[in-house]
């Protein structure tokens, strides 16, 4: 029995063709990877994420459904935090699940009223990064290597891979929903520096225990 982080095994040529570009870059055969689907740092990842955030903000301003869910180890990059604050100002609801560093302040009037940040620290050391955007009901989802830190987005080679398979997307969405429903180990990361447990009257749910038997 193995408990591990998320991975994806695919023969989708949209992804494999882009990965070939990444490996050619790493091998020194080309100066910059040219990708159509993968977001690759330090070249297109930051720009692509900002575009996805702006698309959600545009939908919210038009009164259309919108939303962002992020699962990260760390959220430190000031430019990305500003982009999330701007989207919150436009009314985009956001759920952020973090394990470590967080420089974003949730629930600040006029700044981050639509943003909720929680941390789950339990038996297993998690490292998955998932980016989820409502995208007009398309539910665009990425598995990624990068935390939202300046070093990851600007100084390292990192990759965010779009998830196209509907069943894989369904499974990842379920895993996110389980963590968002955790009422045993989840803590709210408050703007005042406190981190109280998130309790409610629902049946006890400990996300990592559910994951173990998933």
Protein language model regions, located:
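Metal-dependent catalytic core segments for phosphate chemistry
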Residues: 8-10, 15-26, 37
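PLD/PLD-like phosphodiesterase catalytic module centered on the HKD motif
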Residues: 1-2, 9-16, 30-31, 42-214
């Amino acid at each position: 029995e193995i408990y591990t982080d998320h991975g994806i095994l695919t023969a989708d040529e949209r992804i494999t063709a882009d990965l070939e570009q990444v490996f050619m870059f790493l091998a020194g055969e080309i100066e910059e990877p040219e990708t159509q689907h993968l977001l690759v740092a330090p070249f297109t990842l930051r720009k692509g994420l900002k575009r996805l955030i702006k698309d959600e903000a545009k939908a919210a301003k038009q009164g259309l459904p919108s939303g962002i869910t992020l699962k990260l180890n760390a959220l430190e990059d000031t430019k990305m935090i500003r982009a999330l604050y701007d989207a919150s100002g436009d009314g985009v609801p956001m759920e952020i699940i973090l394990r470590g560093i967080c420089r974003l302040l949730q629930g600040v009037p006029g700044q981050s009223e639509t943003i909720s940040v929680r941390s789950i620290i339990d038996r297993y050391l998690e490292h998955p990064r998932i980016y989820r955007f409502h995208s007009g009901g398309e539910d665009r989802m990425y598995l990624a290597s990068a935390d939202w830190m300046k070093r990851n987005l600007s100084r390292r080679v990192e990759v965010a891979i779009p998830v196209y398979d509907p069943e894989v997307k369904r499974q990842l969405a379920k895993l996110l929903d389980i963590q968002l429903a955790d009422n045993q180990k989840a803590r709210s990361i408050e703007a005042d520096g406190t981190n109280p447990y998130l309790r409610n009257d629902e049946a006890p749910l400990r996300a990592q225990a559910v994951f173990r038997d998933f």
